[in-house]
Amino acid sequence: MDEPIFTKRELAIMQILWGTNEELSARVISEQTKISKNTIQAVLRKLLEAKYIKTSSIGYSGTVLTRLYRPVMTEEAYLSTVVSKATMERLISNFVAQQENSEYLDHLDNLIQAKKDELS
């Protein structure tokens, strides 16, 4: 799998797939976006060929058998490929500097400590 640079349509479809724990058909995806069903099917084929999604099973869409799709790449993995480490460091630094809620900062501190413990 190469580093993804999704088009607007690919990203829109991936966000729909990331937004649910269920496997989705092209018809269900088309109900959640203004993209035409034919375009959705073409984009799904492209994402499938690139191995960013997989056909998880065959199910019914009404009375018709259809492929059901599930993402292979997580949204977190995608975001980490899009945002460089230097950009991420500046983003986090600015985010923390803007925080006025000490409870939220404590929560972030706990997340960081848990990751450090995991790495030790």
Residue ranges and their predicted role:
Residues 3-10, 25, 58-80:
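Short, cationic-aromatic polyanion-contact patches
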Residues 10-16:
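Short alpha-helical "packing" element that flanks the helix-turn-helix/winged-helix DNA-binding module
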Residues 13, 40-50:
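Basic amphipathic alpha-helical segments that dock to polyanions
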Residues 17-21:
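Short helix-capping/hinge SLiMs at alpha-helix to coil transitions
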Residues 22-32:
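Short acidic, hydrophobic short linear motifs in intrinsically disordered regions
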Residues 51-52, 57:
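Glycine-centered, phosphate/nucleic-acid-interacting loop/turn motifs that mediate DNA/RNA or nucleotide
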Residues 76-120:
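Amphipathic alpha-helical dimerization/coiled-coil segments
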